[in-house]
Structure formats: C-alpha cells, structure tokens
Amino acid sequence: MGVANDSSPEYQWMSPHRLSDTVILGDCLYFNNIMSQLDLHQNWAPSVRLLNYFKNFNKETLLKIEENDYINSSFFQQKDKRFYPINDDFYHISTGGYGIVFKIDNYVVKFVFEATKLYSPMETTAEFTVPKFLYNNLKGDEKKLIVCAWAMGLNYKLTFLHTLYKRVLHMLLLLIQTMDGQELSLRYSSKVFLKAFNERKDSIKFVKLLSHFYPAVINSNINVINYFNRMFHFFEHEKRTNYEYERGNIIIFPLALYSADKVDTELAIKLGFKSLVQYIKFIFLQMALLYIKIYELPCCDNFLHADLKPDNILLFDSNEPIIIHLKDKKFVFNERIKSALNDFDFSQVAGIINKKIKNNFKVKHNWYYDFHFFVHTLLKTYPEIEKDIEFSTALEEFIMCTKTDCDKYRLKVSILHPISFLEKFIMRDIFSDWINGGN
C-alpha cells in the first residue's frame, strides 16, 4: 500500500486506505477507534410497536418514575450547569446546514450527508485535504491557526442517523402526549412539538423520564437530546423533503475549547484579554495573518474559505508564544489561547478545485470575498465593536457595499483587492498590542 504525499494538491485524488466502497484519509487508528464505538447498522422495531409500548403508561405511572431518585445528568442540555457526561457516549453538540456534530471524549465527530448524484466521494474531500495541504506547506507559526482533521471516512452509509432521529422524535412525541393525557399518535405539528419540547427540556422531572425511556426505547450510545431542536430543523426542513439520507462522510477533529462566537465580555476577561473588543481584534488579526501567509505561497493566491465567520473559528489552548513574521515586523501572541480556522467544506486552494464552490460562484473572488463576509458577521455577532470608534470605522472599509452587490453579507460582484490591502490594514496602531510584541 502506497503512502500519499499530503503536501501535494493531488493528495485529494489519492486513496491511501480502502474499505470496499469506502475510503479513509488520514490516521486509520483514530478513525477505526471511533468507528468501533458506533453501530452503523442499528435498527429498531416498527414505530407502531413503540406506540403500543407507550400504551402501557399513563400520567400516574409517569409520576412514579419522576419520584425516583435516579437521574442521568447527560440528558440535561449541555449549556445547563446540571449537565454531566456520565457515560462514554456520543453527545450531539451541533447541527448546521451541512453537518451533524458529536463530541466523544476529546474528539469531535462530524457526519456530512453528501449529494452523491452531484459529486463523487473523492470530490467531497476539501474539508480534509485543503487544511492538510495548507498546514504542510506553511512554514511558520501561522500553520498553528488551522484546524486539521485527524481522519476522514468517505462514502459511508449514514442512514442510521436519520433512523435514530426518527426513533427519538417518536419517543418524545409519545412521551409528551402521555404526560399531557392526550391520545397517542405519531402525527405531529412542527410548531406544536417544538413548543412542547422546549418548555420541558430543562425540567428535572422531564430529564428523569428521559433517563428511564431513552435507554429502554433508544438503547444507543448516541445521545441526541442535546440541541435536539437543531436536529429537528435539519431533518424537517422543506428543502430536504425528498432527500435521501443514504451516504456521506465521517470526519474526526480535535476538540476545541469554544467556537469564537461563544466568547462574551466575561469569558474574554477570563481568557486574559483587557476587553471583548481586544479579543475581537485578536481573532481578526490572527485570521488576517493566516490569509496573508497563504497568499505568499506559490500558486495559492486563489485561496477561498467561502464561509469565514466567528462560529467557524475555534479556540484552542496555546502553550507557547505564536510569532509570525511579515516584512520587517513580527507579530507576537502571548495569549494562552489561539484561534484556528475550521470547516473547509467549501474551500479551494492551488490545484484543489472544489466543485461545490465552483458551481455556486458566478464571478471570480479572492480573499476580499471572505473578509467582506467576516466583517459583516463580526459586527452582527458583536455590536460592542461600535464602542471602539477607531476599530469600527476601520472595519467599515471592508463593507462598502450596497444591496445590488451584496446579498446576506455575501458579495455578488467581483472585487479583487490585492492582498497588500490586508497587509497594510494590520500594520495600523489598532493592532499595536501584538506588533513587535507590543513594543
């Protein structure tokens, strides 16, 4: 078996490890360790049998369960202080438009359903190959500002996730109906169900019921109760009415401390920043330096992330200073955290052309497209920026747009400012805390 050189753009077309019709990129040990804890073939009895099962319960029997002392604290929502992961389970932490994300131990596992009729499995590898290519070609500390997946499995059968979701949804429907003394039915209104679930999810009595019924009815080490409403919105969205939840990719990442958008004033101070605005300058500067260094690489001036925003920037511990040299300056970061760019699903660089982005963009773009969107999302996420007149005024230079050339913060026209625009921008006194170590 050959070894692929992942510093080459052609790496994405190679298949280092094959498993029948599946492919594993990266570290097989990490991947197989995670896969050994998943049952991709688990299925359940027909839903009508679940309905008959719940006919054995009524409001009185549920009250007796609620009176028990036993409670599995992993069924609280993760933002609840009472939440505690008592088992080595997969805990749902996020569902977005393109992936369902779980945490297990110190790993993050992302499942992505792919449109197999539009792309071959090897055309969906950008989330692994682009950051790996950049990491291996960048020479300085800037490479530390990239999140690289440890492993990626292509073309795996993922129907179990949709089946699991439906099983949990039906359990919750029947449980809530029993609590309310209603006639049992698997029919539901999205608005009514979400209202009922959101009203109960933080209740200790409801968590006691989940502690009883989830193991009995679901019997899985995948806990989707956390942020279940996000999963509901994903699977129930009208645009996926006829979607086939058949195959996709499984990606394994290191576990971050937070995503950048989760930091508020209190947490920024706790992390060692003088203010929330200083923290925002910190992540902006690190991302700007990363882009500048990427654009210095041969043939990489076509790099696009295509979704640069605070929740796609992750924060990790930083145990040593990060020093990045640019012309006659050096930028020194002594903070105990670092920011790192994540989620390269729609990215492209050098010879790695991403069909997803190619099909979506009608005009040519460069780094400015990403930073135009980034600044818009920063200002939306952090209105506190306006209190710093100098910083907010400077950021306005990235969003001098109108409704005709910008839609939902995304440029519709081609504006190809040279990367020197960004280089000059970060040399301003706004970032003096880090230029030459703050001296």
Swiss-Prot record:
Catalytic activity: L-seryl-[protein] + ATP = O-phospho-L-seryl-[protein] + ADP + H(+); L-threonyl-[protein] + ATP = O-phospho-L-threonyl-[protein] + ADP + H(+)
EC number: 2.7.11.1
Keyword Cytoplasm: no
Taxonomic superkingdom: Viruses
Domain Protein kinase: 87-439
Coiled-coil residue windows: none
Keywords: ATP-binding, Host endoplasmic reticulum, Kinase, Late protein, Nucleotide-binding, Phosphoprotein, Serine/threonine-protein kinase, Transferase
GO CC terms of this entry: host cell endoplasmic reticulum; host cell endoplasmic reticulum-Golgi intermediate compartment
UniProt induction comment: Expressed in the late phase of the viral replicative cycle.
Official protein name in the record: Serine/threonine-protein kinase 2
Source organism: Vaccinia virus (strain Ankara)
Gene encoding the protein: OPG054
